[in-house]
Each structure stands twice: as structure tokens, then as C-alpha cells.
Amino acid sequence: DASKSRGLGDVYKRQKNPVLGLLNVGSEHIKGNSVVKQTFEDLKKISPKINFYGFIEGNDINKGNVDVVVTDGFSGNIALKTAEGVAELIFTFLKNSYKSSLVSKIGYFLSKPAINRFKTRIDPRKYNGAVLLGLNGIVVKSHGGTDAFGFCNAISVAVSLIENSYINEIEKKIKI
């Protein structure tokens, strides 16, 4: 039930009145499949009670306009894997560029600490573990292609949710 999304977002983000955005193929109301359109209408009906931004596109996810992205697992997984692929592509291009000349190699040597900080910051293994909200239990879905570091981070997410009585907080918030 989309109307409970804000309550789920409140608890998960530990933030009062988080901004919700609904992932869609466009920001126009005529775009999207029937499920997305119906979810939009459901969220719009309760928008006085929630902070509903409206439709967001894939390129809006990381702009900071929304705190919680409402999506189905299929579209969400595509968005996530696309972002990971773009990050890998950027690093491949950078690596090839730095190998192109002696000056580039020196530039790489000088900028390596900054590049490593950036790479660490966007490492998808660090954020591994998609929380499936709205279930009567803790479910954290790990990326199938991760390594031990990423898998441990997904387990840490699950442990944190358990330690913080996540399910009880959700039940209180949305009054199941």
C-alpha cells in the first residue's frame, strides 16, 4: 500500500517527514505503466499527510530532491545496476586516460589520494543491502555479484535494523 510509504520512510531514514519521489520513465503524468500511474494517484490523494515530491526520473535519484525513492523491485534494480555500471565506466575511462602519456601518469600519481577517496565514497559494496520495506520481518537483499566485504555490509544493515527494533517502529508508525 503506497499510502504507508511515508511511514516506512520515516522509520528507515530516521527522519521526520522525508520527501518521497516515485520513480518513473518521465516526470509527466501521462507517462508510466498502470501500476506507477495508480501509485502516483494513491500518493497524491494522501499528499497532505506526506511530503510527496511526485515523479522522479532515474537521473534525479542522486540530486538530493528526495529522501526516499518509491519503486518496484524491477525498476529499482535496473536503476541501481545502471548507476553501478556508470561508476565502473567512469573509472575505466579514467584509468585508460591516465595511461595515455607520461604527463598523465604523473597526474595520476599526484591525484591518486583524491581518486581513492572518491572511489571509496561511491563503492557499491559499502552500500550493499537493499531493504525491502513493508514486510512483516527484516529482509535485506544483497547484490548477487558482491564480495565478502559487500555481503558483510548487507548483514550489518540487517543487524542494525534488528537492534533498532525496526519492525516495531514500522508497526507503530503505520499502525498495522
What are these regions (language model features)?
Residues 10-15, 99:
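Arginine/glycine-rich "motif VI" loop of SF2 helicases in the C-terminal RecA-like domain
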Residues 65-69, 73-176:
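Glycine-rich phosphate/nucleotide-binding loop
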